Amino acid sequence: MSRIANKPIVIPNGVEVKVEGNVLKVKGPLGELKQDFLPYVKVEINGNEMNVKPNVDYMKRRSDLKKMKMFTGTYWRLFNNMVIGVTKGFKKELEIVGIGYRAQLQGKKLVMNLGYAHPVEMEIPSDVKVEVPSPNKIIVSGIDKQRVGQVAADIRKWREPNVYSGKGIRYVGEVVRLKEGKKA
């Protein structure tokens, strides 16, 4: 059973939440997000609080309640991330480690030199903002936590940290365990 869904989600001032059928829409100062949800879940809005509960109208047998409670925890977390996203936003920072490895923005493209024979070009999605404050640092930010994390993971995938030398793209604060090389 999900116990996190027992807590209500606090809706801050300036954030508007609407439920239209099986779609939750959250509008705030940074933008607007919407999320579809299954009919197993019931969303109730009371003033500045939102509750996510299992929808017992869809329960056919007793074992369905376990599945419904599982979904309430998942959707509680998704809806909470939406409220945080439209108020504060999300940010992931990446650092590039390696001699000659660097990144730069060229219009709507992120161009990275990562030791390959050619520079790697990556199209930046419109719902995510990418900044390059220095050639060795990339900041990915946006209001949708899933999109920010996915774009950061896609950038990191171009050159994951090498387990022997540590060179590559890593998240800021990520600890890369280095293996010992061959002994002669």
Swiss-Prot record:
Keywords: Ribonucleoprotein, Ribosomal protein, RNA-binding, rRNA-binding. This is Large ribosomal subunit protein uL6. Pfam families: Ribosomal_L6. Belongs to the universal ribosomal protein uL6 family. GO terms for molecular function: rRNA binding; structural constituent of ribosome. This protein binds to the 23S rRNA, and is important in its secondary structure. It is located near the subunit interface in the base of the L7/L12 stalk, and near the tRNA binding site of the peptidyltransferase center. Coiled coil: none annotated. SUPFAM superfamilies: Ribosomal protein L6. PANTHER family: 60S/50S RIBOSOMAL PROTEIN L6/L9 (PTHR11655), LARGE RIBOSOMAL SUBUNIT PROTEIN UL6M (PTHR11655:SF14). Part of the 50S ribosomal subunit. The gene is rplF. GO terms for cellular component: cytosolic large ribosomal subunit. One of its GO terms (biological process) is cytoplasmic translation.
